Amino acid sequence: MNTTQVILFAVVLVLTVTVGQADEDSAETSLLRKLEEAEASMFGQYLEESKNSPEQRCAGENVPCDKDRPGDCCSRYECLKPTGYGWWYASYYCYKKKSG
């Protein structure tokens, strides 16, 4: 009789611990989901637009470009043949537009 009680107690203990951990995991998951939904509603559209904008994807200055495709360089840059240290390269590069 005593052995049966010990085994029953052990089974109940294991089930209690297992179910308790499952509840904690689901609570963390639901909290994470709520936080992600709140973040998406507050910042999601703005962040997605700003990350995907052409200016944010802009590689910047001294990046190879194709002179026949004006969209290779960002709006602040223009596709020019290199001068000075880069004259031996065959391709064009994005340089800052000259003011004036």
From Swiss-Prot:
GO molecular function ontology, one term from the record: toxin activity
Signal peptide residue numbers: 1-22
Tissue: Expressed by the venom duct.
Top-level division of the source organism's lineage: Eukaryota
Electron transport among keywords: no
Pfam families documented for this protein: Toxin_22
SS bonds (residue pairs): 58-74, 65-79, 73-94
Residues recorded with modification Serine amide: 99
Record's keyword terms, sorted: Amidation, Calcium channel impairing toxin, Disulfide bond, Ion channel impairing toxin, Secreted, Signal, Toxin, Voltage-gated calcium channel impairing toxin
GO-annotated cellular components: extracellular region
Primary location recorded for the protein, binned into one broad class: secreted
Propeptide intervals in chain numbering: 23-57
Family matches, as InterPro entries: Toxin_22 (IPR012627)
Record localization: Secreted
Entry similarity comment: Belongs to the neurotoxin 14 (magi-1) family. 08 (Ltx-4) subfamily.
Role noted for this protein: Inhibits 31.17% of Cav2.1/CACNA1A current at 1 uM concentration.
Domain remark from Swiss-Prot or TrEMBL: The presence of a 'disulfide through disulfide knot' structurally defines this protein as a knottin.
Additional record remark: Negative results: does not show activity on Nav1.1/SCN1A, Nav1.5/SCN5A, Nav1.7/SCN9A, Cav1.2/CACNA1C, and Cav2.2/CACNA1B.
Protein name: Omega toxin Ap2
Protein source organism: Acanthoscurria paulensis
Taxon lineage: Eukaryota, Metazoa, Ecdysozoa, Arthropoda, Chelicerata
